[in-house]
Design a protein with these regions (language model features):
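N-terminal small/glycine-rich loop or linker at the start of catalytic domains
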Residues: 1-6, 66-73
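Histidine-acidic metal/acid-base catalytic patches
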Residues: 1-6, 14-31, 57, 61, ...
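Active-site beta-loop-alpha junctions enriched in small/polar residues
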Residues: 8-12, 35-39, 72-75, 103-106, ...
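Hydrophobic residues within beta-strands of alpha/beta enzymes
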Residues: 32-34, 68-70, 99-101, 127, ...
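Glycine-rich, proline-tolerant flexible connector loops at the mouths of alpha/beta enzymes
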Residues: 33-57
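Flexible, glycine- and charge-enriched loops at secondary-structure boundaries
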Residues: 46-53, 77, 81-84, 106, ...
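Active-site acidic/histidine proton-transfer and metal-coordination neighborhood
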Residues: 59-66, 74-156, 166, 263-264
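The substrate-binding groove and active-site-proximal loops of carbohydrate-active enzymes
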Residues: 71, 102, 211-213
């Protein structure tokens, strides 16, 4: 399977966007995702100012590495969709295609999500919804229900291999999802047995992910259940892998390409 592969910013979040682009190019990746929105107030994000955006655009063109998605938007009762406009403008300027989100439960969630999708559509962007065990929408069925209820034509279900599995999803479930919801997938491995509590799940997601075939997630089965044209990226933050960035990125790329070839020869 010879197809484009992306590198998610969360894998090397200490790198600036330009550094990430250069690393991706050196390791063989075709595109990147970028952290342009903080996961909580004051948390790290790399949204550039106007001058930084122009420079990043220049670097991306020079390296031949594109932007696919930007993250992370937590949709809760406090979120003002207008606050997302700078992120959307930057993503559109750089040729991005999708925004990654997750959501909590609150009155008006469906309308809020639909409004964000409508706002994103004005910038030529789609919105992917990710299942996370510690958020209000913590099963794949919950996420798919919101997509359906919103009626948004640019909405999708982000198949993160770790989150989908830890939230109770199975590879077979993906075969039943309407194909127009399956735009993007993020790959990594992890131990077969899930952590015992939410603190453990958080720690695993944020720093305990493994290279493909180092763990026990059903990665080949997940890939086999996905549409042929789904966009594949790697999201693999690790708190223990101390290899130099380029060495680690190349190892991640090689392991993921081998997985893809085995799953869909």
């Amino acid at each position: 399977m010879n197809r484009p592969l992306g590198l998610g910013h969360f894998t090397f979040l200490h790198l600036s966007p330009a550094e990430l682009v250069r690393l991706a190019r050196g390791a063989g990746f075709d595109f990147v995702g970028m952290r342009f929105n903080p996961v909580s107030p004051g948390a790290l994000n790399w949204l550039p100012d106007a001058a930084g955006l122009a420079e990043l655009d220049r670097v991306m063109r020079g390296e031949g590495v594109g932007l696919y998605d930007v993250e992370t938007v937590i949709i809760d009762a406090t979120l003002d969709p207008a606050a997302l406009v700078p992120m959307m403008e930057a993503a559109a300027r750089l040729g991005g295609q999708r925004i990654n989100t997750c959501a909590d439960r609150f009155d008006g969630l469906v309308d809020r999500f639909a409004g964000i999708c409508d706002l994103a559509n004005g910038y030529g962007l789609g919105v992917d919804l990710e299942c996370m065990a510690w958020r209000g929408l913590n099963t794949p069925a919950d996420c798919l229900a919101l997509l359906r209820d919103s009626g948004a034509g640019n909405a999708g279900y982000l198949v993160d291999a770790l989150h989908h599995t830890r939230c109770g999803g199975a590879p077979a479930d993906l075969s039943a999802v309407p194909a127009h919801y399956l735009r993007s997938a993020q790959l990594c491995d992890a131990p077969k047995e899930a952590p015992a509590d939410l603190d453990g799940l958080l720690a695993e997601a944020r720093g305990g992910r493994l290279l493909p075939d180092e763990g026990g997630l059903p990665l080949a089965e997940i890939l086999a259940a996905l549409p042929e044209d789904i966009v594949l990226s790697v999201e693999l933050p690790s708190a223990t892998d101390e290899r130099p960035d380029l060495e680690r990125a190349r190892a991640i790329h090689a392991a993921t390409v081998a997985l893809m070839a085995r799953a869909r020869p």
